[in-house]
Regions:
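Active-site mouth of glycoside hydrolases
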Residues: 30-254, 258-268, 275-278, 289-290
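Compositionally biased non-globular segments, especially hydrophobic aliphatic-rich helices
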Residues: 10, 26, 298-299
């Protein structure tokens, strides 16, 4: 199993080079990818990055976090003070196209307020746009109550699954959303980086997420942000993720990844991702149902 996993990672590296060579054109999202030297210089100028995936305790999902009625700056301030005391200097935070669609101006004001709270505690977040995980549908307004004992009971995919078939309608809206947010904060030093898509292909989307993944990289590149961009690989064993992973590995400025494996296999992951000669950031790890008894999961 270990050898098979290693082969898959190596394959992604070389397969990705071939994919990029075959798919690039004059409008390629790879045209303005940061060079290895530029991203290494950027990374060398950062502190040792330590943080967590963050949503306030009073919000069940991204919509509730950013909606005007439920945005809880007092709670956020309290929790970020705790994060600062723990030594955290970054957070991974999910945005919401649903809130932006219904209240773009208000949402950006709340994002600005959130960034000011972050700066107060010397925290620079990375923002996530899209997500293929958990509940397939979402709606603006009051969100469901949490289900006791159910992990992520109210978390929602973004965009909703029901919207994805009509790309002629969906993509222009999402492009406007992405470009509005990125252009607003493209040179804002309160933001560490942009994480464009959480676990593309999850929830049985598989390679159907490639189109949106490709487009979001292009839309963000069009805005020429001063911050690096990434999307993290997360499934190393499924052949149906090879094209997605290859694209992310060959278009991200900085390589990010998720790993819920044991310590030895995580070390193997790092070893092979270093072949890409770019800095690495692990944006999800820790608790695993497979290795729940291992003390290293809480390091």
């Amino acid at each position: 199993m270990k050898n098979k996993w290693c082969v898959n990672v190596v394959f992604l590296f070389f397969f990705g080079i071939c994919v990029c060579a075959c798919t690039q054109d004059s409008n390629s999202s790879n045209n303005s990818r940061w060079s290895e030297e530029k991203i290494q210089e950027w990374y060398d100028n950062q502190p040792w990055l330590v943080g967590c995936n963050y949503i306030p305790a009073t919000a069940i999902n991204q919509i509730e976090m950013w909606s005007a009625v439920t945005f809880d700056s007092e709670q956020i301030d309290k929790e970020l003070s705790w994060a600062h005391e723990l030594g955290f200097n970054t957070l991974r935070v999910f945005l919401s196209s649903v809130v932006w669609q219904n209240d773009a101006t208000g949402m950006k004001k709340r994002v600005d307020e959130f960034l000011n709270i972050c700066r107060k505690y010397s925290i620079r977040p990375m923002f996530v746009f899209f997500d293929d995980c958990w509940n397939p549908e979402s709606a603006y307004g009051k969100q469901p109550e949490p289900k006791p004992g159910v992990h992520n009971s109210g978390w929602v995919q973004d965009p909703s699954c029901s919207l994805r078939k009509d790309t002629l309608t969906l993509y222009p809206f999402l492009q406007e959303y992405i470009k509005d947010i990125v252009r607003t904060y493209a040179h804002d030093d309160r933001i560490l980086m942009w994480d464009l898509y959480n676990e593309p292909g999850n929830s049985k989307h598989e390679e159907t997420s490639l189109s949106l993944l490709t487009n979001v990289f292009r839309w963000v590149r069009d805005c020429k942000p001063s911050q690096p961009i990434t999307a993290g690989i997360w499934d190393y064993n499924s052949s149906r993720k090879n094209v997605l992973n290859a694209f992310m590995l060959n278009h991200s400025d900085i390589i990010s990844y998720h790993n819920y494996d044991n310590e030895a296999r995580h070390a193997e992951c790092i070893k092979f991702l270093k072949m890409l000669n770019r800095p690495l950031i692990c944006t999800e790890y820790m608790l695993s149902l497979i290795h729940i008894s291992e003390p290293t999961r809480l390091r």
